């Protein structure tokens, strides 16, 4: 009762300056811009925004950040999928095979139709590289504003939308890899450049109190930073991105909200930042989040009755108020799987 009274009459109730002078970057959701945001993104959004608000209330200088993965293999598949659907519109579906590993959703067909409506059939005569570059650009120009709109509806306002492509275009990924090489943490094998992740992790775990015997029993593996074809891996870009946060932009700490399926990546990224002298083991904080199961009438719901597609954030917000959704997502620890009861939330 006291808290409710204070919230109504004392706008600054509970605010402290304990975090004064410390700058925290809180990165959350960061969904691939290749399709609509899903239930897992909804949980990460509620958790990340709540955590950022708490840090802000405790006096920290907080930046809410969304990392847009607009480079790499996922975007290549995205462009390839739109391109195939576009060519099917122009040349006939029976004449253009769809790539097996492409994105099969109706949203890809809608993007291809949108591109066709704007540009007509003329792009069929362009080179595949030129055509797919245009498809990626068009698809992102449609999807990213939709993501921003959905997140604003979800009462999340970001301070920074950071494009992965800027790290590659500026040479920052290559520079970061060269720094690791200069510190002796890389080696070449089979034409590729590898990070000695095994040694970095061993040193990290020993510093954290593990014995040599315990460390020797771990199944550790090294990571490719630059493939034999000259392209940098997602891990190399991720190291560069977090170096950008901790070194170039000077945040005291970087806090990331990740799905629990990325747990194997946590120590590796921290260790790589340790190798750069950035104390990643202490300055990079990863909050892992378990899956969400949507229930209706006590049964799992995987598809939207309205659209026939997987449940997206916007579908959820058509059924449930924003405050109810955010409350439910934060009602259990992020380390526990969450059953989201749609009937209860609507009531």
What do the predicted segments below correspond to?
Residues 1-347:
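NTP-dependent nucleotidyl-transfer catalytic core
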């Amino acid at each position: 009762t006291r808290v409710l009274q204070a919230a109504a009459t004392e706008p600054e109730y509970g605010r402290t300056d304990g975090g004064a002078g410390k700058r925290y970057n809180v990165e959350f959701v960061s969904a691939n811009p290749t399709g609509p945001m899903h239930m897992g993104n909804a949980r990460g959004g509620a958790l990340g925004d709540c955590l950022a608000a708490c840090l802000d209330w405790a006096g920290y200088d907080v930046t809410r950040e969304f990392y847009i993965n607009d480079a790499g293999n996922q975007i290549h598949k995205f462009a390839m999928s739109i391109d195939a659907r576009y060519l099917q519109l122009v040349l006939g579906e029976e004449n253009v095979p769809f790539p097996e590993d492409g994105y099969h959703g109706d949203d890809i067909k809608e993007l291809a139709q949108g591109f066709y409506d704007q540009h007509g059939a003329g792009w069929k005569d362009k080179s595949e590289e030129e055509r797919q570059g245009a498809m990626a650009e068009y698809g992102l120009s449609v999807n990213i504003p939709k993501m921003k709109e959905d997140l604003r509806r979800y009462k999340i306002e970001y301070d920074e939308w950071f494009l992965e492509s800027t790290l590659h275009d500026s040479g920052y990924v290559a520079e970061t890899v060269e720094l690791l090489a200069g510190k002796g943490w890389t080696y070449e094998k089979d034409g590729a450049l590898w990070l000695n992740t095994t040694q970095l992790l061993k040193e990290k775990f020993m510093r954290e109190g593990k014995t040599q015997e315990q460390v020797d029993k771990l199944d550790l593996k090294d990571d490719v930073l630059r493939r034999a074809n000259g392209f940098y891996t997602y891990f190399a870009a991720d190291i560069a991105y977090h170096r950008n946060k901790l070194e170039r932009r000077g945040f005291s700490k970087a806090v990331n909200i990740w799905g629990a399926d990325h747990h194997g990546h946590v120590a590796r990224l921290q260790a790589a930042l340790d190798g750069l002298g950035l104390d990643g083991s202490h300055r990079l904080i990863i909050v892992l989040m378990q899956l969400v199961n949507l229930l209706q009438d006590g049964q799992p719901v995987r598809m939207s009755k309205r659209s026939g597609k997987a449940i997206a954030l916007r579908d959820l917000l058509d059924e449930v108020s924003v405050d109810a959704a955010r409350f439910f997502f934060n009602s259990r620890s992020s380390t526990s799987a969450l059953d989201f009861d749609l009937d209860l939330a609507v009531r």
